[in-house]
Amino acid sequence: MGQKIHPLGFRLGVTQSHLSNWCVQPSQYSELLQEDEKLRGCIKEYVRKYVRTAENYGGIDRIEIQRKTSAIKVEIHTGFPKLFVEKLGPRLKEIRREMQNTLQKSKHLKFIISLAEVEKPYAKATILAEYIAVQVERRVAFRKTIKKAIQLAKEQGNVKGIKIQIAGRLNGAEIARSEWAREGRVPLQTLRAQIDYCHYPAHTIYGVLGIRVWIFQEK
């Protein structure tokens, strides 16, 4: 079988940047990296509880974390900032407290949480994959959902190619299989190509479906 390299990790330092920006001693690196993942998990859990519903979804593209000597800056990139402010604004103190309780080494640091709006949300693989997951969990036909997702991405204007794959017990079938659709070019072997990628799970009554989205954008 051919071995597939992760499209984002393959392009780190070329077209992709790191989500955690800080410098520490090598002995502290793994511990702080785990803390960053816990912070992201904490935020996503609050979004799942209080923002995401059958009609609305989180719409998080990425969460960037910067560490300074006295503070941790968390920047949430979302396609729907108004929804975030409306749902999570009143719970901001609670979120900060939960984040401090999650960490061990960085409890004493100040937390700065900010929102950044994504101009073209459906040109982002993470947001599009989450949209597909919400539709599939609501029992919308997966082929119809894929077709609609491709249409939403193409309407953003800067998308040159898109590929979507769904794998699992589709439509409740006994045997799992995968279905995919592609429009335009998705040159995964070209390093300078601006590729966005996401793998997202959808939880259905028949089991978990794996959704994968590749988007090729203009620079």
From Swiss-Prot:
GO cellular component labels: chloroplast; cytosolic small ribosomal subunit
Pfam families in UniProt: Ribosomal_S3_C
Matching Gene3D superfamilies: 3.30.300.20, Ribosomal protein S3, C-terminal domain
Family annotation (SUPFAM superfamilies): Prokaryotic type KH domain (KH-domain type II), Ribosomal protein S3 C-terminal domain
Subcellular location, record wording: Plastid, Chloroplast
Biological processes per GO annotation: translation
Keywords: Chloroplast, Plastid, Ribonucleoprotein, Ribosomal protein, RNA-binding, rRNA-binding
Protein name (Swiss-Prot/TrEMBL): Small ribosomal subunit protein uS3c
InterPro entries documented for this protein: KH_dom-like_a/b, KH_dom_type_2, KH_sf_prok-type, Ribosomal_S3_C_sf, Ribosomal_uS3_bac-typ, Ribosomal_uS3_C, Ribosomal_uS3_CS
Similarity annotation: Belongs to the universal ribosomal protein uS3 family.
This protein's record includes keyword Plastid: yes
HAMAP family noted in UniProt: Ribosomal_uS3_B (MF_01309_B)
Domain KH type-2, chain residue ranges per copy: 47-119
PANTHER family: 30S/40S RIBOSOMAL PROTEIN S3, SMALL RIBOSOMAL SUBUNIT PROTEIN US3C
Quaternary structure note: Part of the 30S ribosomal subunit.
Molecular-function GO terms, alphabetical: rRNA binding; structural constituent of ribosome
CDD domains linked: KH-II_30S_S3 (cd02412)
